[in-house]
C-alpha cells in the first residue's frame, strides 16, 4: 500500500502551482488574492480565507464547495478526451515534437497492463513523485529520470517545446495542454480536500469513456478499492474490492445495465479463478443494487489513501 500524509501535501497545493486553486481564488478580492499567492502552504491559504472556521475540516469543506461549484471547472470534461484531441491534432502537423514519442508511450494500452509497470507509475507520479523530488538535490541527475515518467511533468515539457516550434495549430495545442494541466490540478485538489490525494495514470482503453479508482484503509487495516467506470457501450459500472487480513477478498459489483450484468455473471467463475491465482482467498462476489453503493467508506474510520484517474 502506498500511503501519503498531509505534511507531504501541504506545500504542493499553492495558487502558483495548482491552476484549479488559482481559478477558484479569482472570485476573491484582488488584494486578498495577491496576499494568498505568497502563502507557503494550503493550510495558511485556508486560514486566510476562512478565519471564522473552527477547524481545518470546515475550511476544507468550504473550499471544496467553491471548487465543485466553479462554472469553469464544472465544464472541464475528461482528461482522456482532452488527451485524444491533443494527439489527433498533433498528427496533422508536419513536424514532430521531441517529446511526442514519450507521450505516445505513456498512453499504454490497458490490455497490456503489467502489475510491476503500474506500481512503478503510481510510485513515480503525483504526490509520491513530488515528495521524492523534495528530498533530492536540484542538481541530482535522478530528477530527470523521475520526471520522464510523470504525466504532469511531460505536459510542462510539451508546452515548452510547443512554444519553440512554429506549428500551424500551435494555439489550439497550447490551449489543450493548459486544459490538461488544469484538469489534473482540479482532481488533485478535489481529492486532497476530501482528505486524500489524486493522480492521473494515462492508459488507452477504447471501451472506456471515463474512469477512476480510489484506495482506502480503515482503522482495522482493511483495504477498500472503489472502481468507477463509464463504458461506451454499457454505461456505468461500479466495483468495490474489500481486502481483509491481507488475503481475504470480497467483491461487490453494481451496474444499471442488465446486459452487462448478465455478461459479468456468466464470467464469474473465470474472474474468481484469476483472482485466486494471485494468492488471494476470494470469500464472496456479489451483485448489488446501484442504489446501495454508499458503503461504509463514508464513515469516519475509513480514510482515503489516494485516487487515480484513468
Question: Where are each of the predicted segments found?
Answer:
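Extended non-catalytic alpha-helical interaction modules
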Residues: 1-236, 242-310
Amino acid at each position: 500500500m502506498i500511503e501519503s500524509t498531509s505534511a507531504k501535501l501541504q506545500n504542493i497545493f499553492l495558487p502558483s502551482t495548482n491552476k484549479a486553486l488559482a481559478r477558484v481564488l479569482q472570485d476573491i478580492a484582488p488584494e486578498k488574492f495577491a496576499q494568498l499567492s505568497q502563502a507557503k502552504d494550503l493550510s495558511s491559504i485556508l486560514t486566510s480565507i476562512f478565519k471564522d472556521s473552527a477547524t481545518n475540516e470546515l475550511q476544507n469543506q468550504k473550499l471544496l464547495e467553491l471548487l465543485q461549484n466553479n462554472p469553469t471547472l464544472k465544464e472541464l470534461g475528461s482528461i482522456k478526451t482532452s488527451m485524444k484531441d491533443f494527439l489527433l491534432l498533433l498528427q496533422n502537423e508536419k513536424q514532430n515534437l521531441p517529446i511526442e514519442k514519450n507521450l505516445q508511450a505513456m498512453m499504454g494500452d490497458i490490455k497490456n497492463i503489467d502489475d510491476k509497470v503500474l506500481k512503478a507509475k503510481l510510485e513515480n507520479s503525483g504526490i509520491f513523485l513530488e515528495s521524492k523530488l523534495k528530498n533530492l538535490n536540484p542538481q541530482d541527475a535522478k530528477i530527470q529520470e523521475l520526471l520522464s515518467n510523470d504525466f504532469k511533468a511531460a505536459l510542462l515539457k510539451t508546452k515548452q517545446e510547443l512554444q519553440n516550434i512554429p506549428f500551424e495549430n500551435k494555439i489550439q495545442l497550447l490551449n489543450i495542454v493548459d486544459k490538461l494541466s488544469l484538469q489534473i490540478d482540479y482532481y488533485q485538489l478535489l481529492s486532497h480536500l476530501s482528505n486524500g490525494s489524486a493522480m492521473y495514470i494515462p492508459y488507452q482503453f477504447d471501451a472506456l469513456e471515463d474512469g477512476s479508482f480510489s484506495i482506502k484503509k480503515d482503522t482495522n487495516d482493511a483495504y477498500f478499492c472503489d472502481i468507477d467506470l463509464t463504458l461506451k457501450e454499457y454505461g456505468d459500472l461500479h466495483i468495490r474490492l474489500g481486502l481483509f487480513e491481507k488475503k481475504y477478498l470480497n467483491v461487490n459489483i453494481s451496474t444499471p445495465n442488465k446486459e452487462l450484468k448478465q455478461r459479468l455473471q456468466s464470467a464469474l467463475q473465470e474472474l474468481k479463478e484469476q483472482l485466486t491465482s494471485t494468492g488471494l482467498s476470494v470469500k464472496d462476489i456479489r451483485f448489488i443494487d446501484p442504489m446501495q453503493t454508499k458503503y461504509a467508506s463514508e464513515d469516519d474510520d475509513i480514510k482515503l489513501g489516494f485516487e487515480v484517474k484513468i
